[in-house]
Amino acid sequence: MKNKYQPFWFSEAIASETQLNIRQLENKIQSDICIVGGGYTGLWTALQLKKKQPSLNIVLIEKELCGSGASGRNGGCMIPLTTKFSTMKKIIGERDAMNMVTASESALFKIKDFCDEHNIDAQIRIDGGLYTATNKTHEGVLDNLIQNLKTSNINSLNRMPKAEIQKKAGSLKHIDGYFSPLSGSVQPGLLVRGMKKVAEKRA
């Protein structure tokens, strides 16, 4: 079902394009690989496959516009899986959980490098993020997580003084918390539409 409303991020990205370059599937075609869905996952899969094996004939099909689904209508928060480490450790084991955390953290910089390489202005900022408590019940909730991260030597969160947290957050509601430099933001619509253009060039 077609979305009745377009989110701001996606609308802004579409408005910045002089030509949408929509190619409709009208006849039967053949390909080595067919990818269904033109969001982050579909486009990145196509890009990586083409990079590893340029001779592949890859077709990507999308019902609406590339990026018009979840990829173009999320909050644009670039947050790694750091705070999920303890849970993942119980489910998949320490080594795999560590790999998941470090991979998700390095992904921030890989996305930025990709945008820099292809001149995609996706408004990426990797300025870090706050993980805070706003009431007494929340205080200390992350302590066990931090200890687990330290034990596995992958901790990137550092406790920040209350006054500094409040200043950085712009609110006195924050009474305790940690800061991690490995967090950021992106204009999701511009990112996914930029990925589409790169994929078209490599087709």
Enumerate the predicted regions with their spans:
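Extreme N-terminal leader/targeting segments of oxidoreductases
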Residues: 1-33, 51-57, 83
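Dinucleotide-binding Rossmann-like beta1-alpha1 core, especially the glycine-rich loop
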Residues: 81-163
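Glycine-rich Rossmann-fold phosphate-binding loop(s) that bind the pyrophosphate
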Residues: 37-41, 63
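Glycine-rich FAD pyrophosphate-binding loop
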Residues: 50-73
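Helical element adjacent to the flavin cofactor pocket in flavoenzyme catalytic cores
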Residues: 148, 173-203
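Gly/Ala-rich phosphate-binding loop of Rossmann-like dinucleotide-binding domains
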Residues: 46, 50, 198-200
